[in-house]
């Protein structure tokens, strides 16, 4: 039974990474052009370098981990998928170093990147920032995490 459970978990994690890869590619295909270098995606990291359409700086985006947390608010389970990314501009004068969180909001087709150093990730703080919703993500559909934080706190945001 244990191996069966592990197999299910492993399969789910593999699916999560595949979905993460797909979303990252879709999101940044619109915002970033000329993918200069891409390394193979693995279960531990996903790394590629791309240049923006509006400037020549190159960004290295490394997905450190993908994990899911569950928060309960007003009887609804909000499924939160976080893509932790270390983003660093190759131009030292403009560098932005640190750990960032990429929040995907399929319901509203929005994405946000937050600087984790500027946001308290404890449950209470996250719940205070959530916009109330009346629908929650189906646990079988990894593509439907529902979370919205104030866009004014986002480093970068956009639609897809």
Feature names for model-found ranges:
Residues 66-89:
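Mg2+/Mn2+-dependent nuclease catalytic core
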Residues 23-32, 50, 86-93:
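Hydrophobic, Leu/Ile/Phe/Ala-enriched alpha-helical segments that form helix-helix packing faces
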Residues 110-160:
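Intrinsically disordered, low-complexity terminal regions enriched in charged/polar residues
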Residues 46-69:
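Conserved catalytic cores of phosphodiester-cleaving nucleases, focusing on short active-site segments
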Residues 1-40:
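Acidic-basic catalytic patches of nuclease active cores, encompassing PD-(D/E)XK
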Residues 88-119:
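Nucleic-acid nuclease catalytic cores
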């Amino acid at each position: 039974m244990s191996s069966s459970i592990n197999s299910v978990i492993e399969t789910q994690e593999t699916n999560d990474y595949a979905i993460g890869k797909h979303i990252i590619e879709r999101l940044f295909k619109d915002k970033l052009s000329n993918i200069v270098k891409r390394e193979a995606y693995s279960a531990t990291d996903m790394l590629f370098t791309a240049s923006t359409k509006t400037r020549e700086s190159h960004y290295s985006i490394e997905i450190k981990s993908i994990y899911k947390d569950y928060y309960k608010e007003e009887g609804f389970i909000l499924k939160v998928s976080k893509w932790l990314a270390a983003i660093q501009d190759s131009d030292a004068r403009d560098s932005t170093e640190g750990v960032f969180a990429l929040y995907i909001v399929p319901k509203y087709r929005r994405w946000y990147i937050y600087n984790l150093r500027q946001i308290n990730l404890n449950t209470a703080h996250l719940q205070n920032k959530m916009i109330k919703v009346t629908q929650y993500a189906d646990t079988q559909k990894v593509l439907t995490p529902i979370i919205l934080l104030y866009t004014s706190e986002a480093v970068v945001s956009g639609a897809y």
